[in-house]
Swiss-Prot record:
CDD domains: Frataxin. It comes from Histophilus somni (strain 129Pt) (Haemophilus somnus). Keywords: Iron, Metal-binding. Involved in iron-sulfur (Fe-S) cluster assembly. May act as a regulator of Fe-S biogenesis. PROSITE patterns: FRATAXIN_1, FRATAXIN_2. This is Iron-sulfur cluster assembly protein CyaY. GO terms for cellular component: cytosol. The gene is cyaY. One of its GO terms (molecular function) is ferrous iron binding.
């Protein structure tokens, strides 16, 4: 994946996150600032999904933990085999919102 494809891929991920949260009626606010996408929950807690361009990785941080994902086999996968979308669902649940991204 080249840099342009990397950015396009992550921007699609961010768009899908925002669309699914809205469609499923989650009480959250989404904001993008440069390479950082933030989901803020009603209690002001946050999930941060950000680009790590030098590594071509996608990072996720929340009170459920921190994860680093690389794009392999057409999906974002952590080194331990966890999938991005599953980790994001678990993180949202830890912040009080049940949402499905599949």
């Amino acid at each position: 994946m080249n840099i342009a494809e990397y950015h396009q891929n992550i921007e699609q991920v961010w768009l899908q996150i925002e669309e699914q949260l809205e469609e499923q009626g989650c009480d959250v606010d989404c904001d993008t600032q440069g390479s950082v996408f933030t989901i803020t929950f009603a209690d002001r807690s946050q999930i941060v999904v950000n680009k790590q361009e030098p590594l071509l990785e996608l990072w996720l941080a929340s009170k459920a933990g921190g994860f680093h994902f690389a794009f392999k086999n057409n999906q974002w996968i952590a080194q331990d085999g966890k999938l991005f979308w599953q980790c994001l669902e678990q993180a949202c649940l830890a912040h009080g919102e049940q949402v499905s991204f599949s």
